[in-house]
Amino acid sequence: TSNFLRNSRVWPKNAIIVVIPVYNIGGALNRNSTTRTNQNGPKEYGFRGNARNYDLNRDFIKADTRNAHAFIDLFRTVKPDLFIDTHVSNGADYQYTLTHLFTQHNKLGGELAKYLHKALMPQLEDSLQNKALAITPYVNVFNRTPESGFSQFLDSPRYSTGYTTLF
């Protein structure tokens, strides 16, 4: 995997990369700095809801919005082998450069699950650690202390990462 990413000569000739730079443009443009009183920074942030106040990150399986329909059409057209969703954690203070959430590998099954769990995930984690980037798995904290434990986030089909594992 790391050789594939470093060496441009090994890229397949038919590789297609699709990027959606901002999925929730209405929320991104709705900037504020005072609605999260318990949060120290950032200076400005967007809003979870879109211009019609739909939380687009929780609309994938319901598809109540045009955004979700456009995503579904694009996803079905491209049929990606790999799907990556990056976004902020709504102000949670995790104290890490990056929190990551790989879908539960058993949702994928077969060779893809094995590749995700045994190759891609460990190689990415090791690569970031070797670059001195503090990383940790994304967990639900729900106002609990570390001593009482944390639960892993379940990416159900309402979220992009859960939705995309259905296909």
Per-region residue spans from a language model:
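Hard-cation-handling environments
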Residues: 141-167
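Active-site/substrate-binding loop(s) of hydrolase catalytic cores
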Residues: 1-121, 125-145
